[in-house]
């Protein structure tokens, strides 16, 4: 979601955003209870709209995220909770007295059905520090590498991976990583490093590393010069879309804001639906180069009908009727 709410010191949920031209895009102030009910109603509808293999990511202020998680547990089921992701949004700072500085917000990740959700298990590259740390050796061509044992855990009683190689026995409780004949080929290619004591190890090069699994702390800082308040980091949105959807799938952002989610979806060949109640937001989105799309301006009467609808099919029937 593009629209973020924050909790003030008096416990009220605020949503007051200014566009780049200082035009107010949103202006709401609700009690925490009102806001939680506001979110609950929308989450119930989103659950009905979500495909059986779909996922939902809710980006929220850290002061209210723990309340929202309880609601999402109720709506989607505790078993469908996948992650509470900490997103580093800014450089360290401390504007609070007698408290630690805040540099993160939260992304709650749930699925419709954890046994069936799309999960593409994408990898991300190592950063420069990780490369230097993991691949500390440099060969004669300037390539960084590290070494690993020729053997791996688990004993095999029979077969070539249990036999000695060049008179070197397999350590107890271990087996060769590959057929010893492959070791001969690797050694001829210079891919095995021998120590001064005659211990062989396999070379692994940094430039052949396929990347690392994504963890639950993300470093996607807010855009430096946003075109719209609460604009999200597009690389973060691309990562989410790549992980939890496939080409041709639908991506829905029901607080579309500047349309960054829609832009990322369009780039990654996903179909997209963006919704926003702010005329300023809609104007910004329509100016983005998003290719061909259909735009519906729902009148107040139609919006109220959808708001009061209890099931996905009812909502879709109302939208279809409004087209006539």
Question: Where are the regions a protein language model picked out?
Answer:
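Core catalytic lobe of class I
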Residues: 1-284, 291-292
């Amino acid at each position: 979601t593009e629209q973020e709410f924050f909790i003030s010191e008096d416990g009220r949920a605020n949503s007051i955003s200014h566009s780049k031209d200082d035009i107010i895009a949103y202006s709401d102030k609700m009690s925490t209870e009102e806001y939680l009910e506001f979110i609950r109603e929308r989450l119930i509808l989103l659950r009905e709209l979500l495909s059986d293999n779909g996922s939902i990511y809710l980006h929220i202020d850290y002061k209210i995220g723990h309340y929202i998680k309880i609601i999402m547990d109720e709506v989607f089921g505790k078993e469908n909770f996948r992650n509470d992701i900490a997103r580093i949004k800014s450089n360290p700072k401390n504007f609070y007295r007698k408290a630690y500085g805040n540099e993160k917000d939260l992304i709650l990740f749930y699925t419709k059905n954890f046994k069936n959700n799309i999960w593409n298990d994408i990898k991300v590259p190592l950063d420069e520090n990780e490369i230097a740390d993991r691949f500390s050796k440099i060969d004669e061509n300037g390539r960084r590498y590290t070494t690993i044992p020729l053997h791996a855990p688990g004993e095999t009683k029979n077969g070539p991976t249990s036999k000695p190689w060049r008179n070197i026995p397999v350590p107890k409780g271990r087996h060769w990583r590959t057929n010893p004949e492959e070791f001969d080929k690797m050694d001829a290619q210079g891919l095995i490093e021998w120590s001064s004591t005659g211990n062989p190890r396999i070379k692994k090069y940094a430039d052949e590393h396929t990347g690392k699994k994504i963890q639950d702390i993300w470093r996607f800082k807010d855009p430096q010069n946003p075109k719209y308040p609460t604009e999200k980091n597009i690389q973060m949105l691309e990562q989410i879309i790549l992980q939890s959807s496939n080409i041709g799938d639908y991506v829905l952002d029901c607080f579309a804001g500047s349309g960054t989610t829609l832009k990322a979806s369009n780039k990654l060949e996903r179909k997209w639906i963006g919704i926003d109640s702010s005329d300023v937001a809609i104007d910004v989105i329509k100016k983005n180069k998003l290719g061909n799309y259909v735009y519906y301006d729902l009148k107040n009467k139609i919006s109220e009908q959808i708001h009061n609808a209890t099931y996905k099919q009812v909502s879709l029937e109302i939208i279809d009727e409004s087209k006539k």
